[in-house]
């Protein structure tokens, strides 16, 4: 994460010079898996100066607590934070307490006194990284920022100091879970990021009540389905009516098969339009299917980057794919069930679209298991809702009993004499 081996290295002129020998004691390491932390204490002496450095790792949120104590030495020491691994030209900035963000342009240098934080950052992405230094326990820290290909933060600390250092992804959810999104000028979430923040805050609120992340995702799925029910109901009714209309559309198309003259084509379009009006089908209703996608995209990004501290059932980590592929199999059958409910009046369409879900199976194999769990439960709820809507629409169309004029095959519409038959259809 941090370039080189000099991260957390102390300097203080001749007193702590890397060129002079030092006497180091064996490190004392203590691991607490329950608390998800590891403590290491390093002690060494150089030129009569005694240094005790305590490092506490918090792996799940990429944080490191660094506490230093320097005895028999200078009142202030420098701690180096050199670069971001292989990152090229990271952004180097700092924010003084009560001040505005200040950053280095190009390969220049800049001094900032009494910082709230200092940071090295790549442009935000899934593979970008950040290093953030934040004083703790009232420690006053001044920094010198150095720009350029690697970037460098040199922090001037008192002899006894406490720092919190973040070394992880420069990504919204990781920064939020580590408590850094409230820092001014550090990260500006986009539209999907704002949705992700709402989702993760809702997940945390549910976790306080439920206490299990798998159940939290299931509860979140139900809540989102309830919120989106008006939109999904409109889309479901459009789907149900289209199932009833499609066989009649094929009859009209068959009726005008082989007739390419403008009058016949115009007549076919008029009959199609009349059929859609009779069955109250709004072609724009299908666009409501796109509305849940921003939520799904934000949820995918949230769960993929969320650091869960427990698994669910056979799933060791909800942020990683199912290692046993059980969810992928369930995903396939559930989606085929949804496809059947949506195309039950047109079996040939079911056969055509069923192959597409074999392609979608790849996503179920690679998606975080928490996202796949959400999709499966959401789809099951959608199937139940669609069955209810189908019955409602069929009841409506059967009870209205309106006569719809249909031009018999082989005849011309409009001014020509037409043959009609009566079918059950909804009123206009």
Swiss-Prot record:
GO terms for cellular component: plasma membrane. GO terms for biological process: protein insertion into membrane; protein transport. The chain crosses the membrane at residues 209-229, 283-303, 323-343, 356-376. Keywords: Cell membrane, Chaperone, Membrane, Protein transport, Transmembrane, Transmembrane helix, Transport. It is a multi-pass membrane protein. GO terms for molecular function: membrane insertase activity. InterPro entries: YidC/ALB3/OXA1/COX18 (IPR001708), YidC/Oxa/ALB_C (IPR028055), YidC_ALB_C (IPR047196), YidC_periplasmic_sf (IPR038221). Belongs to the OXA1/ALB3/YidC family. Type 1 subfamily. Required for the insertion and/or proper folding and/or complex formation of integral membrane proteins into the membrane. Involved in integration of membrane proteins that insert both dependently and independently of the Sec translocase complex, as well as at least some lipoproteins. Aids folding of multispanning membrane proteins. Interacts with the Sec translocase complex via SecD. Specifically interacts with transmembrane segments of nascent integral membrane proteins during membrane integration. This is Membrane protein insertase YidC. It comes from Deinococcus radiodurans (strain ATCC 13939 / DSM 20539 / JCM 16871 / CCUG 27074 / LMG 4051 / NBRC 15346 / NCIMB 9279 / VKM B-1422 / R1). The gene is yidC.
């Amino acid at each position: 994460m941090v370039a080189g081996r000099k991260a957390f290295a102390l300097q203080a002129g001749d007193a702590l010079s890397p060129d002079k020998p030092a006497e180091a004691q064996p490190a004392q390491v203590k691991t607490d898996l329950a608390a998800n932390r590891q403590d290491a204490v390093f002690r060494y002496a150089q030129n009569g100066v005694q240094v005790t450095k305590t490092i506490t790792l918090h792996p799940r949120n990429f944080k490191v607590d660094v506490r230093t104590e320097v005895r028999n030495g200078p009142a202030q020491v420098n701690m180096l934070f050199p670069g971001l691994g292989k990152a090229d030209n990271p952004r180097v900035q700092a924010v003084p307490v009560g001040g505005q963000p200040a950053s280095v342009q190009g390969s220049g240098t800049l001094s900032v006194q009494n910082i709230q934080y200092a940071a090295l950052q790549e442009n935000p992405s899934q593979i970008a990284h950040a290093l953030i230094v934040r004083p703790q326990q009232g420690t006053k820290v001044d920094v010198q920022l150095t720009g350029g290909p690697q970037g460098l933060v040199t922090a001037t600390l008192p002899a006894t100091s406490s720092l919190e250092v973040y070394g992880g992804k420069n990504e919204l959810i990781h920064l939020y879970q580590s408590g850094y999104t409230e820092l001014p000028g550090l990260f500006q979430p986009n539209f999907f990021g704002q949705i992700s923040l709402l989702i993760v805050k809702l997940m945390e609120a549910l976790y306080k009540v439920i206490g299990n992340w798998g159940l939290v995702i299931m509860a979140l799925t139900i809540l989102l389905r309830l919120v989106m029910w008006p939109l999904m109901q409109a889309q479901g009714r459009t789907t149900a009516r289209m199932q009833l209309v499609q066989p009649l559309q094929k009859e009209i198309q068959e009726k005008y098969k082989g007739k390419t003259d403008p009058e016949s084509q115009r007549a076919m379009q008029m009959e199609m339009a009349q059929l859609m009006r009779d069955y109250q089908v709004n072609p724009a209703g299908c666009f409501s299917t796109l509305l849940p996608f921003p939520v799904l995209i934000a949820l995918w990004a949230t769960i993929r980057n969320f650091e869960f501290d427990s698994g669910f059932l056979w799933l060791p980590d909800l942020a990683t794919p199912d290692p046993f592929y059980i969810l992928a199999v369930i995903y396939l059958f559930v989606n085929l069930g949804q496809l059947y409910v949506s195309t039950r009046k047109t079996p040939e369409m079911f056969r055509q679209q069923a192959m597409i879900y074999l392609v979608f199976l790849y996503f179920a194999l690679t998606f975080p298991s928490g996202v796949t769990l959400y999709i499966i439960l959401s789809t099951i709820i959608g199937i139940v809702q669609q069955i209810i809507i189908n019955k409602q629409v069929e009841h409506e169309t059967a009870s209205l009993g309106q006569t719809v004029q249909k031009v018999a095959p082989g005849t011309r519409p409009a001014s020509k004499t037409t043959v009609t038959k009566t079918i059950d259809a909804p009123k206009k």
